[in-house]
Swiss-Prot record:
Keyword Glycoprotein among record annotations: yes
Source lineage: Eukaryota, Viridiplantae, Streptophyta, Embryophyta, Tracheophyta
Tissue specificity annotation: Expressed in panicles.
Gene: BURP14
Gene source species: Oryza sativa subsp. japonica (Rice)
Entry-listed glycosylation sites: N178, N225, N317, N379, N432, N450, N601
Name this polypeptide is given: BURP domain-containing protein 14
Length: 690
């Protein structure tokens, strides 16, 4: 019996589609298989001999029409009418959720029960989620290079024993995102932890973009010497927390060499160092040295310790646009000898807060050498120094000796009812300064200078300016005149070092309140953790009012990104990004340079930048009066093409801060010059199509 007419029509339609699919193009379900896709039969394709038909785009042929990715393909085709190929860099970020998973998680989100399956959700949707402590690492389970812990279940190893038998417990490398415990309750011997999350480019727990957590090191140990060499150094987007280091320890000596040094965009916290320790000498060498942008905090150092000799060498020095907070140093300690060498020195536009130093201590010898010296503008406050101390001998050498004026406040120095102390303050200087209160008994105040009342020439100020270690990387900003064929110029490292994540389908993203508390609760980001800081920072930036002439939106789904671009520019749009990271970190030569749209006229664009969040969130803003360029990037020695870059030139910089990195790198002032930069990996710019 002949098949029904509608069945014949369906079969004919399938045959035509197969004819239009070239042999080299495979659907996603075939691309993972070990066999080649079936070729259409010549008998089914008489029209192939008569005319050539453009093949459909691969992204239009998903394995299942019900997946989140397939739904977005249809959405794009309805909204964007520029008839351009789908941008591969953008479509690679789409949700990998299968149709059943997307439906199940959407139902849970609608019922407010997504948290009950959060681990499965994170894994299936390719999200960034805090790790959960797994099995403990011990000396017997590792050869010292971290291999055993790295192979432990997701969430990182513990370190319960840490060589509690009195021997040395070296631990050289650890690259996962969570470490529960190391060297607790050990007796005698020495602990050594060399490297934790050092400068990985990206991935789940690396210093390049991981969310690292170290919970406890050496708690309750007796007579053990310990050292921690490096924690999340050299990374990009450092997001880490260290909860406790040698709490309740007795005897021995401790050292922490470096924490989040040379990091970019930090959100780091250190909870407790040698809390209630007894008779220990310890040193913390560097904390977020040479960091660029972000927030950092240190909760307590040597609090309620007994007979301790403590030193903290540098905190946030040579950093750019860092908001720092140090809550507690040596408070209520007994017989302590404390030294803090430098805090926020040579920083650019810092926001520094130091809340308490040696308050309520007994018979302490305290020394603080420098706070925000040689810094450039910014706002700083120091709340309390040796307040309510008994028998204290304290010295504070320098506060607020800045290169350029900032707002600095010192609220209390040596205050309290007990006059049995000897305290000296060597120098307090700066513009816009206030010193609210200090004890009149037993306190020697040598010098207070208000720089606005002093005649300091620009030449003298420039002469004492230190080298700008926080200057932007060469090539990060440049002038429009540099975009000419044949020009040799430095290319910055444009690699995306944030952890890999995917968009959520809009159907799910819309059911998650874009609120710091709600997102943190859902993904298990506890207060005080790095993930909580990251979430709060992103939500706050999205809530910031736009600048003059700027229209901004935080897009929590791929559909939101498309909607904003179409709303700003119309439906004839194209998304562009720099093709790869080739050439970054060295000199390159420019090949063909072309303005987009054609002619390089002044235009309006939409730029979208990744924000650090559990799932992909883009900060998109419509920027008026720009020019956008495409350029072939060539190797200097061979003139061979190695990359294809996209650059944007901002023609109106009048609302930019005078301390913006572009003016530090190029000179000039806001409104007096244009500033250009490459579109970094992971970011994108939208313009009207040619």
């Amino acid at each position: 019996m002949a098949p029904p007419r509608h069945a014949r029509l369906v079969a004919a339609t399938i045959a035509v589609l197969l004819c239009h699919l070239p042999r080299s193009a495979a659907s996603p379900s075939w691309s993972d298989a070990a066999v080649s896709p079936p070729s259409p039969s010549p008998q089914l394709c008489p029209m192939m001999q008569q005319r050539s038909v453009l093949p459909p785009r691969v992204s239009e042929l998903p394995a299942s029409p019900f997946t989140a990715k397939a739904a977005f393909v249809r959405y794009w085709n309805r909204k964007v009418h520029s008839n351009r190929p789908h941008p591969a860099f953008f479509f690679a970020k789409l949700s990998p959720l299968s149709a059943p998973d997307a439906a199940a998680f959407s139902t849970l989100a609608a019922a407010g029960q997504l948290g009950s399956r959060i681990r499965a959700f994170c894994a299936a949707a390719s999200l960034l989620c805090p790790t959960t402590p797994g099995s403990s690492w011990s000396k017997s389970s590792s050869d010292g290079d971290g291999a055993a812990a790295a192979a432990a279940p997701a969430g990182g190893g513990g370190g319960g024993g840490g060589g509690g038998d009195g021997g040395a417990a070296p631990f050289k490398n650890y690259e996962n995102g969570n470490f529960s415990s190391y060297g607790n309750s050990g007796g005698g011997g020495a602990d050594q932890f060399a490297v934790y999350s050092s400068g990985q480019s990206n991935g789940g727990g690396g210093g390049g973009g991981g969310v690292d957590s170290f919970r406890r090191y050496g708690k309750g140990s007796q007579g053990r010497n310990d050292s921690f060499t490096s924690y999340e150094a050299g990374g990009n987007v450092g997001t880490s927390s260290f909860t406790s280091y040698n709490g309740d320890a007795t005897g021995g000596a401790g050292g922490f060499s470096s924490y989040a040094g040379d990091a970019n965009t930090v959100a780091v916290s250190f909870g407790n160092y040698d809390h209630t320790g007894n008779g220990r000498s310890r040193e913390f060498s560097e904390y977020t040295q040479d960091a660029n942008t972000g927030e950092e905090s240190f909760a307590a150092y040597g609090k309620t310790a007994n007979g301790a000799a403590e030193s903290f060498r540098t905190y946030g020095n040579h950093s750019n646009s860092i908001a720092t907070g140090f809550d507690n140093y040596g408070d209520r300690a007994n017989g302590a000898a404390d030294a803090f060498s430098s805090y926020g020195a040579s920083g650019n536009t810092p926001e520094n807060t130091f809340k308490s130093y040696a308050s309520g201590s007994n018979a302490g010898v305290d020394d603080f050498k420098g706070y925000r010296d040689d810094a450039n503008v910014g706002n700083d406050s120091f709340t309390s120094y040796a307040s309510n101390a008994n028998g204290a001998a304290a010295g504070f050498e320098s506060y607020g000796k800045s290169v350029n004026p900032g707002s600095v406040t010192f609220k209390g120095y040596g205050l309290g009812s007990n006059p049995n102390h000897r305290i000296g303050f060597a120098r307090y200087s700066g513009d816009n300064t206030t010193f609210k209160a200090y004890s009149n008994d037993g306190v020697e105040f040598k010098e207070y200078q208000n720089m606005s009342k002093m005649e300091v020439s620009k030449i003298e100020a420039a002469a004492r300016r230190p080298p700008l270690r926080w200057s932007p990387e060469p090539g990060k900003f440049f002038r429009e005149r540099d975009l000419v064929a044949g020009n040799r110029m430095p290319m910055p490292d444009i690699a995306d070092r944030t952890p890999p994540r995917a968009f959520l389908p809009r159907d799910i993203a819309a059911k998650i309140p874009f609120d710091a508390a709600a997102v943190s609760a859902l993904f298990g980001a506890a207060p005080g953790t790095a993930m909580r800081q990251v979430v709060s920072s992103t939500v706050a930036e999205c809530a910031r009012p736009p600048s003059r002439g700027e229209t901004k939106r935080c897009a929590t789904s791929a559909e939101d990104v498309v909607d904003f671009a179409v709303e700003m520019l119309g439906d004839n749009v194209v998304a562009r990004a720099t093709e790869s990271t080739a050439g970054g970190g060295g000199d390159v030569r420019l090949g063909r340079v072309a303005g987009v749209p054609a002619g390089g006229n002044v235009t309006r664009s939409v730029s979208c930048h990744q924000s650090l969040f559990p799932y992909l969130v883009y900060y998109c803003h419509s920027v008026p009066t720009v020019r956008v360029y495409e350029a072939d990037i060539l190797a200097v020695d061979s003139n061979q093409k190695i990359n294809h870059g996209v650059a944007i030139c901002h023609l109106d910089t009048s609302d930019w801060s005078p301390n913006h990195g572009a003016f530090i790198a190029l000179g000039g002032k806001p409104g007096e010059m244009e500033v250009c930069h490459w579109i970094f990996q992971g970011d994108m710019t939208w313009t009207v199509a040619n």
